[in-house]
């Protein structure tokens, strides 16, 4: 059975990296079980393996270069970071299917708050259509990102994971081009007018987890 841990307070990012790497290695060695780790971080930016220097507009907070996929993203208070240390040796060695399952998991959790999350080809993460905002210059509808996804696999065990905006300071995103995508914005559950707290989201994530990541046999 997949273990769940919720970290109290704000978790130092480098300590989180060290913990994830150690746990992923233990899972790969058969010495530990899968883990979903729920944390919040102090304000910081992370740069994934595809990050472009031009997308760091202003280093307002510490910048951490990390080995996960993706580009620049922001972490900070009011954002639920979901670190997923799952064994793809047992769940299927299919990276695309794994990322799709992560996206669907977030979409299922958001649906509990009657919020429709969507995915877009070429734009990993979960998006919210914003017909209430002015359209883009080409006439297409604006979309705001509510959840970013970036994972790394080592010996087919995942780490890093998902960042879902509950009530972060969205102005903190101004220092980067989030995930290298300009033209679209970012939003949060509270920004969408939902009176949702971190505990509410955590419960929704727990309820929807098994639908996307069935329990392992044995």
UniProtKB/Swiss-Prot annotation:
Catalytic activity: octanoyl-[ACP] + L-lysyl-[protein] = N(6)-octanoyl-L-lysyl-[protein] + holo-[ACP] + H(+)
E.C. designation(s): 2.3.1.181
Entry's localization field: Cytoplasm
Top-level taxon of origin: Bacteria
Keyword set includes Metal-binding: no
Site residues, Lowers pKa of active site Cys: 145
Keywords: Acyltransferase, Cytoplasm, Transferase
Domain BPL/LPL catalytic: from-to ranges: 30-217
Gene Ontology biological process terms in this record: protein modification process
InterPro entries in the record: aa-tRNA-synth_II/BPL/LPL, BPL_LPL_catalytic, Octanoyltransferase, Octanoyltransferase_CS
UniProt GO cellular component terms: cytoplasm
Binding site for substrate: 68-75, 148-150, 161-163
Further comment found in the protein's record: In the reaction, the free carboxyl group of octanoic acid is attached via an amide linkage to the epsilon-amino group of a specific lysine residue of lipoyl domains of lipoate-dependent enzymes.
PANTHER family per UniProt: LIPOYLTRANSFERASE 2, MITOCHONDRIAL-RELATED (PTHR10993:SF7), OCTANOYLTRANSFERASE (PTHR10993)
Protein name: Octanoyltransferase
Organism: Paracoccus denitrificans (strain Pd 1222)
């Amino acid at each position: 059975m997949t273990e769940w841990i919720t970290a109290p307070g704000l978790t130092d990012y480098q300590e989180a990296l060290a913990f994830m790497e150690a746990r992923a290695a233990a899972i790969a060695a058969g010495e530990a079980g899968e883990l979903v780790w729920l944390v919040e971080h102090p304000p910081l930016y992370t740069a994934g393996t595809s990050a472009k220097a031009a997308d760091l507009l202003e280093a307002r907070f510490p910048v951490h270069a990390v080995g996960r996929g993706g580009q620049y993203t922001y972490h900070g208070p009011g954002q639920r970071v979901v670190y997923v240390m799952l064994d793809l040796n047992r769940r299927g060695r299919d990276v695309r299917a794994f990322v799709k399952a992560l996206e669907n998991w977030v979409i299922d959790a958001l649906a509990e708050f009657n919020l429709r999350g969507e995915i877009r080809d070429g734009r990993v993460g979960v998006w919210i259509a914003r017909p209430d905002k002015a359209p883009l210059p080409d006439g297409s509808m604006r979309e705001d990102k509510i959840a970013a996804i970036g994972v790394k696999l080592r010996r087919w065990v995942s780490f890093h994971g998902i960042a879902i905006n509950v009530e972060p300071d969205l102005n903190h995103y101004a220092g980067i081009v989030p995930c290298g995508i300009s033209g679209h914005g970012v939003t949060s559950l509270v920004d969408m007018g939902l009176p949702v707290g971190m505990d509410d989201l955590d419960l929704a994530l727990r309820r929807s987890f098994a639908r996307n990541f069935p329990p392992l046999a044995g």
